Amino acid sequence: MQTAHIGTDIIEISRIRKAIKAHSQRILNKIFTKREQEYCLSLTNPYPSFAARFAAKEAVAKALGTGIGKVVRWKDIEILKSSKHPEVYLPERVYKELGISKVLLSISHSREYATAVAVTLI
């Protein structure tokens, strides 16, 4: 029988927008992978997608039980869009070290907030 761990996060889109405008490329490069940046910046309004990915990374880190830090860094968690649902990419070492078999993710945003729920299967 598999064990599941859940993580969730919510963030104001305006908070991400302000951070990106204040710190621009520095904050983008610290938190988001090149592919995440390319996708979000291809949109007319990239801030909801950046905020959703930020919330997703937080939710995944919580579901992993590690938070963001020594075991998992911001850019270790990559959130990419697929045709059906968001996909989570982690380094193989994270799967092995934490005994994770799969990560499931749901993300959403409204006009003001972005939210994410992640489930890790062990």
UniProtKB/Swiss-Prot annotation:
GO terms for biological process: fatty acid biosynthetic process. Mg(2+) binds at residues 9, 58. It comes from the Bacteria. Its cofactor is Mg(2+). It catalyses: apo-[ACP] + CoA = holo-[ACP] + adenosine 3',5'-bisphosphate + H(+). It is found in: Cytoplasm. Signal peptide: none annotated. One of its GO terms (cellular component) is cytoplasm. GO terms for molecular function: holo-[acyl-carrier-protein] synthase activity; magnesium ion binding. Pfam families: ACPS. Keywords: Cytoplasm, Fatty acid biosynthesis, Fatty acid metabolism, Lipid biosynthesis, Lipid metabolism, Magnesium, Metal-binding, Transferase. Its EC number is 2.7.8.7. Coiled coil: none annotated. Gene3D superfamilies: 4'-phosphopantetheinyl transferase domain. The keyword Thylakoid does not apply. Belongs to the P-Pant transferase superfamily. AcpS family. Transfers the 4'-phosphopantetheine moiety from coenzyme A to a Ser of acyl-carrier-protein. This is Holo-[acyl-carrier-protein] synthase. It comes from Chlamydia caviae (strain ATCC VR-813 / DSM 19441 / 03DC25 / GPIC).
